[in-house]
Each structure stands twice: as C-alpha cells, then as structure tokens.
C-alpha cells in the first residue's frame, strides 16, 4: 500500500479503513479525525522508513 506522509488529506472513514486493514486497533467509540491521523502516523507512516 501507499502510506502517506500527510494522512490528514484522507477522510476519517478512509483513515479508519486503512488502519483496520493494517491490523491497527481503533480506539473505542467515535473519535475526532486527528486521533486517527495520529494513529496512522504512528503505525503506518513509520513502517515505510
């Protein structure tokens, strides 16, 4: 997959589906988009370095 340096360009739904697809556990309940952006940066963007 193509992991973005700036995941904030994605929609929240897209962020969530990308995280789930990469076996990242989502926080319970509905979070602000920046929560998912942070998870994406921690788990996905970091993987490609």
Swiss-Prot record:
<dbReference type="InterPro" id="IPR013146">
    <property type="entry name" value="LEM-like_dom"/>
</dbReference>
<dbReference type="Pfam" id="PF08198">
    <property type="entry name" value="Thymopoietin"/>
</dbReference>
<dbReference type="InterPro" id="IPR011015">
    <property type="entry name" value="LEM/LEM-like_dom_sf"/>
</dbReference>
<dbReference type="GO" id="GO:0005179">
    <property type="term" value="F:hormone activity"/>
</dbReference>
<protein>
    <recommendedName>
        <fullName>Thymopoietin-1</fullName>
    </recommendedName>
</protein>
<dbReference type="InterPro" id="IPR051656">
    <property type="entry name" value="LEM_domain"/>
</dbReference>
<feature type="domain" description="LEM-like">
    <location>
        <begin position="4"/>
        <end position="47"/>
    </location>
</feature>
<comment type="similarity">
    <text>Belongs to the thymopoietin family.</text>
</comment>
<keyword id="KW-0372">Hormone</keyword>
<comment type="function">
    <text>Hormone of the thymus with pleiotropic actions on prothymocytes, mature T-cells, the nicotinic acetylcholine receptor, and pituitary corticotrophs.</text>
</comment>
<feature type="region of interest" description="Biological activity">
    <location>
        <begin position="32"/>
        <end position="36"/>
    </location>
</feature>
<dbReference type="GO" id="GO:0003677">
    <property type="term" value="F:DNA binding"/>
</dbReference>
């Amino acid at each position: 997959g193509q992991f973005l340096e700036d995941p904030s360009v994605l929609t929240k739904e897209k962020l969530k589906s990308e995280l789930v697809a990469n076996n990242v556990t989502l926080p319970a309940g509905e979070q602000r988009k920046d929560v998912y952006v942070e998870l994406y940066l921690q788990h996905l963007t970091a993987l490609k370095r």
